[in-house]
Amino acid sequence: MIVIADTGPLNYLVLIGAVDVLQPLYKRVIVPQAVVQELDDAAAPAAVRTWIAQPPVWLELRPDPPSDPTLDFLDAGEKAALTLAESLNADELLIDEQTGRAEAERRHLRVTGTLGVLANAHLAGLRDFDQSLARLRSTNFRLHPDVERLVRRRIAAAKKES
């Protein structure tokens, strides 16, 4: 499985102490250099900068792909992550920002955000969704109530199927 991550999901998963769910869920996660730079930026939280300074073995750092000028409306990390996901024919792109998600979906990429990762971790028995969500709310993560309802319905439906 090829999974590419943008800055947002990694940032929030580090902040809530749940970044370790990525390895059992996806085995390996690939990030472009632009995402590494955003995670290591002076404006990034100290915990995030510390984490990316010594990335786990399952996090594969890649050079940025050639720039796609049609994506100049996105920030550098989103643009590089989306372009890398396209170039590698990724199975999934981890991205939170709505404009980037919409563009990725328009390009027929499968997207999952921080909340989706937490839902998958819950369904895999790795984390309690409500506890993870409470931690996420203690950050500056913006969560629309409709999105939360949708994810909760997805969790309930998946539990019924199993």
Protein language model annotation of sequence segments:
Residues 18, 100, 125-128:
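Short phosphate-engaging motifs
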